[in-house]
Amino acid sequence: RYTRAVPAVAYDLMELSEKPLTLVLDEGMMVASAVLGPESTIAIRVTQDPICRELVRRLRKPLVSTSANLAGGPSPTCFADITDSLKSGVDYILPLRQAEKKPPVASTVIRLKADGQIRILRK
């Protein structure tokens, strides 16, 4: 729906991945141009988080997010590390897991090209 074609290997990766996974696919579409990467690529995060999955299911739309820091600023590893100025600049913060101190696992990022090329961008 948000890319012209999903390579068959993407489904295998989604099923077999044991950690968060982001797939960078060709020909992103039906999203704001600011969401697209170079050459109109689209990065789709496959999440197992039950809250995110339920939000997407109920909204019937993808969620768009960014890092919890300003460009060039330090990357927070837990909610307490997010600056107050950033928190006050958003519309809503889910009242969940704010006391957690364990850093989340970064996603594996894999570039899947329509011609079959596969490139691991981040393990």
Regions found by a protein language model. Give the residues of each.
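Active-site-adjacent structural elements in enzyme catalytic cores
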Residues: 1-123
